[in-house]
Regions:
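Hydrophobic alpha-helical segments
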Residues: 1-206
Length: 206
């Protein structure tokens, strides 16, 4: 469900249908977030290319950490759960829950803790970021300026995506109900998970 009308998966044609098919091939169903892009499928295509390029220089651990921190700060359930799950595969479920609760688990390096706070502050109010904050990353923790750019880009891109989806009332997919209950409740602090069954571009899921 969303606040605007969207094209149902089995009724889509042209570019919208092609976009749905690509999403379905990745997720196994057409995710709710894709449906609001049915009005502008070219935006989804360009967003996908932009995100891929932003992600390319970073390793999975850093990308998922920054993305999760931003999504959790914005209380976006779907992105928090999706990227929290990915991050849990790298650092463990309990550590992801700890981060969600504002802790700094020992599994994180000192640099990663600083990166985490940097990403949170970008999300809260980027105007308050000072040169000193950037120099803490470069001079104390040894990050390159290119790496600082990458972190800022990853965080800012997630702000765009989550705010767009929440502003249009996009509900997290029902598929998230299959996740561990404790993880779901402690990590997914945002819009409630949809009760609607997933849609497919064909009559039945393969």
């Amino acid at each position: 469900m969303a606040f605007i009308k969207t094209i149902r998966a089995r009724e889509a044609s042209g570019a919208a249908h092609d976009m749905y098919k690509r999403q379905e091939e990745h997720w196994g169903y057409v995710p709710n977030y894709a449906k609001v892009f049915s009005h502008r499928p070219e935006v989804m295509a360009r967003w996908g290319r932009l995100l891929a390029e932003i992600r390319r220089p970073a390793d999975d651990r850093r990308f998922e950490l920054v993305t999760f921190v931003v999504a959790r700060e914005l209380k976006h359930s779907a992105c928090s759960l999706a990227h929290g799950k990915q991050l849990a595969g790298i650092i463990g479920k309990d550590n992801v829950i700890a981060i969600a609760e504002g802790q700094e688990p020992d599994v994180l390096t000192a640099a990663e803790v600083t990166i985490m706070h940097f990403a949170r502050d970008i999300t809260r109010d980027a105007r308050k970021i000072t040169r000193g904050r950037v120099e803490e990353l470069t001079k104390i923790h040894g990050l390159s300026e290119e790496e600082v750019f990458d972190i800022a880009a990853i965080a800012s891109a997630r702000v765009f995506f989550t705010k767009m989806l929440d502003s249009l009332g996009v509900e997290p997919d029902n598929a998230f109900m299959s996740m561990d209950l404790e993880f779901r409740e402690k990590v997914g602090k945002g819009r409630p998970i949809s009760h609607m069954r997933p849609e497919f571009t064909r009559d039945e899921a393969a």
